[in-house]
From Swiss-Prot:
Mapped zinc finger ranges (RING-Gid-type): 386-453
Biological processes annotated in GO: negative regulation of gluconeogenesis; proteasome-mediated ubiquitin-dependent protein catabolic process
Keyword Transit peptide: no
PROSITE patterns named among the record's database cross-references: CTLH, ZF_RING_GID
GO molecular function: ubiquitin protein ligase activity; zinc ion binding
Organism, as annotated: Kluyveromyces lactis (strain ATCC 8585 / CBS 2359 / DSM 70799 / NBRC 1267 / NRRL Y-1140 / WM37) (Yeast)
Any one cellular-component term (Gene Ontology): GID complex
Name of the protein in its database record: Protein FYV10
Protein purpose: Involved in the proteasome-dependent degradation of fructose-1,6-bisphosphatase.
Family assignment from sequence similarity: Belongs to the FYV10 family.
Key words, A-Z: Cytoplasm, Metal-binding, Nucleus, Zinc, Zinc-finger
Location of the protein in the cell: Cytoplasm; Nucleus
First-listed, main subcellular location of the protein, grouped into a coarse class: cytoplasm
Lineage: superkingdom: Eukaryota
Length: 468
């Protein structure tokens, strides 16, 4: 990497603002905890001192006064311990920020001193940091039940690389855990707990997440035929949103009647039809003895009400709920919704992408009667080392712009064959000689083979091409 295209420290800071945004939010939350703790204990201590003063006025209540004084001492000790924990937590966060500032200052020094070795070492550690961020966000989680600590491959990677102070993995894995519970286990409980703990932020933003999560809880209760719990959920939680989401609540109330009408009209239908219907719409097993397992396929499929309630019963609601949660979570901590690793990869891809990328020549190859010829041409002739054309990376480049190349790579001696394909004449002749030498073909001295359609032509058939 030359000094002309070497990104400066501001470039990296802009793409890694979350390394400072997350600690900033954690400091703010720590300060809020301190204020709440101080306020609550101040009120409690004032009450205890008032009681103590009352007891001291009566000389016959010395023992009670001593007990109350001990209570005050215990309360102060508890307050001191909790304040000390918050203070230590704040120092830990500040130390992390200092180390991250120093980390990027190192890059600036290495770049200024043109120290290539140290700069490459810094980039390796930085690449590890990007990979760790991606793994923590998307890796599968496991719980150490003994210590009640969540872990995944990303955290293990962070610890082996010594990057604990450069990434707030505790925050990222919290989002990962809630997200995985939604997508894989269809479990709303962790999400609802997070919403309760962050209700002030969600209310301030006017978020729809709380309503959508409670609505999904109601729908799942109806799915399970727990009608009493569903009605209780509707009355306790959803009814408060009547003025904001009247249309959605009307549909939610109608789902209960819809299920019951299907139940009453489908008593005599065959079990196989019921299984298909519930497997398609209600996420039921193929067959379980259940009150709702007697719904009629013909009645429901032809029921116009199904069109109304379909969107609420759609399993894609879990995916949209997950996206909504991640958006709110990342917004809270000012985290980039897009993975930094993929952002950097996209930047590299966009500088390499051309209009020819993604067009696989191997799919156009016509097989030769000799399988060894096919294998050789596929591996040594049409194989490309272009990273953009890699089947794992190309999907990332589909929405990226093409690179602007000011130079073109042209064949030195371009010729066109009678079939319209254009090649470098020397490379085409060299390929034919190699195939003959390895015994794959028996071409004459003046013959060449088109590597794509395997047609054989004489060199006298070449048509000289002149790039314009």
């Amino acid at each position: 990497m030359t000094s002309l295209n070497e990104p400066n420290v501001d470039f990296h800071l802009k793409l890694n603002q979350q390394q400072f945004n997350i600690p900033s939010e954690l400091l703010k939350r720590n300060w809020d905890k301190f204020n709440n703790l101080y306020t609550s204990y101040s009120v409690e201590l004032q009450g205890q001192f008032a009681t103590l003063n009352t007891l001291l006025e009566d000389p016959n209540k010395d023992e009670q006064s001593i007990e109350k004084l001990n209570d005050i001492i215990n309360t102060v000790n508890i307050l001191q311990k909790r304040l000390s924990q918050l203070h230590d937590n704040e120092l830990t966060i500040l130390e992390r920020i200092e180390k991250r500032v120093e980390y990027f200052k190192q890059f600036e020094r290495f770049k200024y001193d043109s120290n290539t070795d140290k700069l490459l070492k810094w980039y390796r550690s930085y690449t590890d940091l990007l990979i760790a961020d991606y793994l923590v966000r998307h890796g599968s989680n496991s719980i150490d039940h003994k210590n009640k600590i969540a872990s995944n491959s990303g955290i293990e990677f962070i610890k082996t690389r010594g990057l604990e102070d450069l990434i707030d993995y505790e925050v990222l894995i919290e989002a990962n855990q809630i997200s995985m519970e939604l997508i894989e286990n269809k479990n709303l409980r962790p999400l609802l707990e997070w919403i309760e703990n962050n209700s002030a932020h969600l209310t301030e933003k006017g978020s729809h997440l709380q309503f959508q999560a409670l609505l999904q809880e109601y729908i799942e209760l109806v799915r399970c035929s727990d009608y009493k719990a569903a009605i209780r959920c509707f009355q306790t939680h959803l009814a408060h949103f009547a003025n904001i989401y009247p249309k959605e609540l009307k549909l939610a109330a109608g789902i209960l009647a819809f299920f019951k009408s299907c139940l009453n009209n489908g008593r005599d239908d065959e079990v196989t039809n019921e299984q298909k219907l519930f497997h398609a719409y209600f996420r039921k097993q193929m067959y379980r003895p259940h009150p709702l397992s007697s719904i009629s396929s013909s009645n429901v499929v032809h029921n116009a009400e199904l069109c109304r309630y379909g969107p609420l019963l759609d399993h894609e609601r879990w995916e949209s709920l997950n996206k909504m949660f991640l958006h709110e979570f990342y917004s809270l901590y000012k985290i980039s919704y897009h993975d930094p690793l993929l952002i950097y990869i996209s930047l590299g891809i966009s500088s390499l992408k051309t209009k020819d990328c993604g067009h696989t020549i191997s799919a156009q190859l016509i097989p030769h009667e000799n399988p060894e010829v096919n294998e050789y041409i596929k591996s040594n002739v049409v194989n490309t080392d272009c990273p953009v054309c890699n089947h794992d990376i190309f999907p990332l480049s589909e929405n990226l712009p093409f690179a602007h190349h000011i130079q073109s790579s042209l064949f030195e001696n371009p010729v066109m064959l009678p079939n319209g394909n254009i090649y470098d004449s020397e490379k085409l002749i060299s390929l034919s000689r190699k195939l003959n030498k390895m015994g794959y073909t028996k071409l004459k001295e003046n013959q060449v083979m088109d590597p794509i359609d395997k047609s054989i032509y004489a060199t006298t058939d070449f048509i000289k091409m002149y790039p314009t």
